[in-house]
Design a protein with these regions (language model features):
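N-terminal alpha/beta PP-like core and its mobile active-site loop of ThDP/TPP-dependent enzymes
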Residues: 1-140
């Protein structure tokens, strides 16, 4: 049975026992939010801003010992995570942040809300991945 990448994303979160997701919707991540809609195993926390979101995930991880998990859209949504990612990383707080991205064929073409978040976070995060296409999901 084929499932969408968004459905696979939700399935992976559940398999990793993520029960709280700090998330702010936007165009390039909207399919992920549709897949999360009605999901009862994952509580989605919707803050007023991505910067608040990432710091809330950091605080959640510090207070519970669990991984703080974030989901935002591309461009400014992703860029707004940088300070919180750096804070968590420098204090060895476990955090995983997912961002949307423009369509693969538009990467590098200065398209609307495109930000090279992989390069931006190289100095402040342990690992960065840009998933292109369905085959890479199967390798993870």
């Amino acid at each position: 049975m084929r499932i969408s990448g968004a459905e696979l994303f939700v399935k992976a979160l559940k398999e990793e026992k993520v029960d709280v997701l700090f998330a702010y919707p936007g165009g390039q991540a909207i399919d992920l939010f549709h897949a999360l809609y009605g999901e009862t195993d994952i509580k989605v926390i919707l803050p007023r801003h991505e910067q608040g979101l990432v710091h809330a995930a950091d605080g959640y991880a510090r207070s519970t010992g669990k991984v703080g998990v974030c989901l935002v859209t591309s461009g400014p949504g992703a860029a707004n995570l940088v300070t919180g990612i750096a804070t968590a990383n420098y204090d060895s707080v476990p955090m995983v942040c997912f961002t949307g991205q423009v369509p693969t064929k538009l990467i590098g073409n200065d398209s609307f809300q495109e930000v090279n978040i992989v390069d931006i976070t190289k100095a402040s995060a342990n690992t960065q991945l840009l998933l292109k296409g369905e085959k890479i999901w199967l390798k993870l």
